[in-house]
Amino acid sequence: MSLLTEVETYVLSIVPSGPLKAEIAQRLEDVFAGKNTDLEALMEWLKTRPILSPLTKGILGFVFTLTVPSERGLQRRRFVQNALNGNGDPNNMDRAVKLYRKLKREITFHGAKEIALSYSAGALASCMGLIYNRMGAVTTEVAFGLVCATCEQIADSQHRSHRQMVTTTNPLIRHENRMVLASTTAKAMEQMAGSSEQAAEAMEVASQTRQMVQAMRAIGTHPSSSAGLKNDLLENLQAYQKRMGVQMQRFK
């Protein structure tokens, strides 16, 4: 796996699923391929994206700044600086300085990542802030190692939280989760279907599902009534794709 592929993988792991994630993935691919060279426009685009947490925006801004060539005097962006200040906690800043001194002696991506993984996400973000604000300089490889370690720490806590929700025995939470998944799957189906004649059927199924979920929420239904909703929808989607000559087995 190449270095940039690894960086893209880690960064995307902390971005919530949805159309925005696909957009960010495309931007990262363009940046890493050298196709997008307007850093200012890229940062303005990132700043106005909804849904993303300030820290995720800060990390993406840091990656874009590392990768896109820019004039020396280009102003640093406040939204990135604020996100990478370790919540203003002096302990984070102290640890960040110690980490920075270690990273300065390191030259490889994997070496930097190994060192960084023993620090908290707050200290890692503060260390990125030091480098972003030009208070410290490390090689691009080392900076990417720091980025990936930070993303791994964040993704780990997201995964633990997600696992707790998926394994919960509370029927009301499970019911709501199934309805949310069915609704987002329906939305994705509508986007994928496009405007061809064959798409009308898929659109109809997706629309009916969304209406059903709205009705279930409006009138309040038994927690078991949502069982299988998402899987029924995915079976319809796969049948539609088969007719269109597309084989996608990875949805379930």
From Swiss-Prot:
The keyword Protein transport does not apply. Residues 1-164 are annotated as: Membrane-binding. InterPro entries: Flu_matrix_M1, Flu_matrix_M1_C, Flu_matrix_M1_N, Flu_matrix_M1_N_sub1, Flu_matrix_M1_N_sub2, INFV_M1. Residues 165-252 are annotated as: RNP-binding. A motif (Nuclear localization signal) lies at residues 101-105. GO terms for biological process: viral budding from plasma membrane. The keyword RNA-binding applies. It is found in: Virion membrane; Host nucleus. It is a peripheral membrane protein. Keywords: Host nucleus, Membrane, RNA-binding, Viral matrix protein, Virion. Signal peptide: none annotated. Plays critical roles in virus replication, from virus entry and uncoating to assembly and budding of the virus particle. M1 binding to ribonucleocapsids (RNPs) in nucleus seems to inhibit viral transcription. Interaction of viral NEP with M1-RNP is thought to promote nuclear export of the complex, which is targeted to the virion assembly site at the apical plasma membrane in polarized epithelial cells. Interactions with NA and HA may bring M1, a non-raft-associated protein, into lipid rafts. Forms a continuous shell on the inner side of the lipid bilayer in virion, where it binds the RNP. Belongs to the influenza viruses Matrix protein M1 family. This is Matrix protein 1. It comes from Influenza A virus (strain A/Malaysia:Malaya/302/1954 H1N1).
